[in-house]
């Protein structure tokens, strides 16, 4: 591993004795139910936790565990369909905030207790400037004049280390990057010097290097202000390096809690042990010695024409997304492509399948030129080249049954002479992907995220391809489900001799699945080689930064 300083600032470790003082938040017996069409659903079942001044606690668990519902209960942000048990109490500095009036809660929220969310774009108003939104957050809870609030807003942007803060005040949310928008949300959350900051998956949608920057920023601001932090996440690397105390939730129940050090060293509950064991591990199986070349690309360049300027005199400019790229992919091989958002990795991958149009370069698949072919000329190759996307819910037609979704590809490519033959291939593909063959009449919304991704993989393998482009196929999944999909991809490759092009920002998954890796930055390849060599001994400063952000470094 790269010898370097810690990417994350170290957590201030609390002793068990430090938790004997009065808690700033003392939550007891929280139970939350939601009204649904045919009754009620228990989202949170009788949980309790404490938070102390200056401390960071992590509430961890997979999707549906109830961790975000717990946070929203504290903030008073539950929907009208939700009801909190009458025996529940949430004491903030000794006062039960569940008994507060709406007015009292509004005075507390964003003032003494603040919250930042996973996707800042959904929390920022797209029609107002950044400056006006921060000023509004300040003036709701203070008597500052507009001029004083504007000065305070500028100071906050400086504190969260946004470049060119004066210019950012006049910009709109869509003009900022994801990391910059999250910094704005932190500035707004801290605008009234809260005692508690609740961070609900604050870095999940961000690149690994930006994740490290945001978490270090929260830690630095916490030290300066003496805040307590509630961190809600499913990322155990972040939990280990960032929190002092951990609560583990599953199916709305508290499974285990302990200091971070003790919980990671000796987890007691089987579910906690399962979570810790779900971190991607292992490596790709060695390729057969006689593996020939399946796909090559040379000098690939992709650009888009973008509109710049005003409404009445827009100017068209060429934006070069990828420039002069090449690769070689062998049969039975998994080649990873990694890089931050905007690096061009997805654009490059899709250009190899002609899902977007390269303006230059050549792509050769199994000895045949792919570039320059018309749609009709590409059709014979489509069944041999398949793709699996990040979000299966977006790529599976919600109006079609699972059977129809998978059979559609067979019909289009003329595979299976009769309906019975096609349905047999559909069932075989589902079973190969770890799904039962009796789900053909069900719809995508009836399945979990992991099950939908298995269905998307089944749709791809039903056509018996030689090459599959996997575009972030595990990034939206919980850790344990992610591990299952990695095992499935390994199994299918071993059984069917598949070649994968695996696009990801998660270097842990890349290490577990790939033989070789390409590192991209700003549309160019900056480093490539065997996965262990690149991740253990990265040559470029950019790759070193990616590796430091992705792995725990002692």
Place the predicted regions along the sequence by residue.
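Conserved catalytic motifs of ABC-family nucleotide-binding domains
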Residues: 193, 464
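ABC ATPase "signature
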Residues: 254-258, 266, 528-529, 537
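A short, surface-exposed alpha-helical micro-motif characterized by mixed small hydrophobic
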Residues: 239-241, 510-512
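Conserved ABC ATPase signature
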Residues: 171-176, 180, 443-447, 451
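Conserved ABC transporter NBD signature motif
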Residues: 85-96, 361-370, 381
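Conserved ABC ATPase "signature" region
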Residues: 96, 148-167, 369, 420-438, ...
């Amino acid at each position: 591993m790269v010898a370097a300083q810690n990417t994350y600032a170290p957590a201030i470790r609390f002793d068990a004795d430090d938790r004997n003082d009065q808690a700033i938040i003392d939550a007891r017996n929280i139970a939350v139910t939601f009204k649904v069409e045919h009754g009620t659903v228990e989202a949170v079942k009788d949980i309790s936790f404490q938070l102390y001044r200056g401390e960071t606690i992590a509430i961890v668990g997979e999707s549906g565990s109830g961790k975000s519902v717990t946070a929203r209960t504290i903030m008073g942000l539950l929907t009208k369909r939700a009801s909190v048990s009458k025996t529940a109490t949430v004491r903030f500095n000794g006062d039960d905030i569940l008994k507060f009036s709406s007015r009292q809660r509004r005075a507390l929220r964003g003032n003494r207790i603040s919250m930042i969310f996973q996707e800042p774009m959904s929390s920022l108003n797209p029609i107002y400037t950044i400056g006006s939104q921060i000023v509004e957050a300040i003036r709701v809870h203070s008597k500052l004049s507009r001029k004083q609030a504007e000065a305070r807003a500028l100071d906050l942007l400086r504190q969260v280390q946004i470049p060119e803060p004066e210019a950012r005040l006049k910009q709109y949310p869509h003009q900022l990057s994801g990391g910059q928008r999250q910094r704005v949300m932190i500035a707004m959350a801290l605008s009234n010097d809260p005692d508690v900051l609740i961070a609900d998956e604050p870095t999940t949608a961000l690149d690994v290097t930006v994740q490290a920057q945001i978490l270090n920023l929260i830690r630095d601001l916490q030290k300066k202000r003496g805040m307590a932090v509630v961190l809600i996440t499913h990322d155990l690397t972040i939990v280990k390096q960032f929190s002092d105390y951990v609560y583990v939730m599953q199916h709305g129940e508290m499974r285990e809690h302990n200091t971070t050090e003790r919980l990671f060293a000796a987890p007691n509950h089987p579910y906690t042990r399962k979570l810790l064991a779900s971190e991607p591990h292992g490596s790709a199986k060695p390729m057969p010695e006689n593996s020939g070349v399946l796909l090559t690309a040379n000098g690939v360049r992709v650009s888009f024409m973008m509109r710049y300027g005003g409404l009445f005199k827009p100017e068209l400019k060429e934006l070069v997304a990828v420039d002069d790229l090449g690769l070689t992919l062998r049969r039975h091989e998994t080649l990873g492509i990694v890089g931050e958002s905007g690096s061009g990795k997805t654009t490059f991958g899709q250009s190899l399948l002609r899902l977007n149009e390269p303006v230059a370069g050549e792509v050769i698949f199994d000895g045949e030129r792919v570039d320059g072919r018309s749609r009709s000329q590409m059709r014979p190759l489509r069944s041999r080249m398949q793709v699996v996307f990040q979000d299966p819910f977006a790529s599976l037609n919600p109006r079609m049954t699972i059977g129809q979704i998978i059979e559609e590809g067979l019909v289009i490519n003329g595979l299976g002479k009769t309906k019975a033959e096609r349905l047999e291939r559909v069932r075989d593909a589902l079973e190969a992907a770890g799904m039962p063959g009796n789900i053909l009449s069900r719809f995508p919304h009836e399945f979990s995220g992991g099950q939908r991704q298995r269905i998307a993989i089944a749709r791809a393998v039903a056509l018996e391809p030689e090459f599959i482009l996997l575009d972030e196929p595990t990034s939206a999944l919980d850790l344990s489900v992610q591990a299952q999909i990695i095992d499935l991809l390994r199994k299918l490759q071993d059984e069917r001799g598949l070649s994968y092009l695996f696009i990801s920002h998660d270097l842990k998954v890349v290490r577990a699945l790939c033989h070789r890796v390409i590192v991209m930055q700003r549309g160019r390849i900056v480093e490539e080689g065997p996965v262990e060599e690149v991740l253990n001994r990265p040559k470029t400063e950019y790759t070193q930064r990616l590796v430091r952000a992705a792995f725990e470094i002692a």
